[in-house]
């Protein structure tokens, strides 16, 4: 659903539609933050995360050094962007995501938690599921807080109260 796609992109990769697999602005920001000792922030795009998911499914070397892994992710992400449409990348990403440890993909997660297909999720439910990604085992309260924090920069009419209610309903 458009609400789900919007929620996922607002939390995971705001410039998804505009970059070619790597968001160099985010990469530069993360490097700058690391150099001055600020808190770590991620710079992986959805395409890079998908590249990582695909590589880890095939690679026996799960402990590849961090910088080497990132370079590999960049290469694979660029290849994905050359051969797949943005829609195909987003669909594969949503189908491979791990939610709450035991669930793979948005379809299974939506069915189990909301008892409906992803296309039937409303905006609040979509925001809650998107907020599960950084920490799938977080409490409903923490997930609602994360989803509310993401509202600040979004273009939605949702209120924090609506999100908290959806989190309580889906995750309790």
Per-segment meaning from a language model:
Residues 1-5, 19-37, 43-48, 71, ...:
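Acidic helix-start/capping segments at beta-turn-to-alpha-helix junctions
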Residues 15-19, 38, 57, 100:
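Amphipathic alpha-helical interaction segments
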Residues 43, 47-172:
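Non-catalytic, structured segments within soluble enzyme domains
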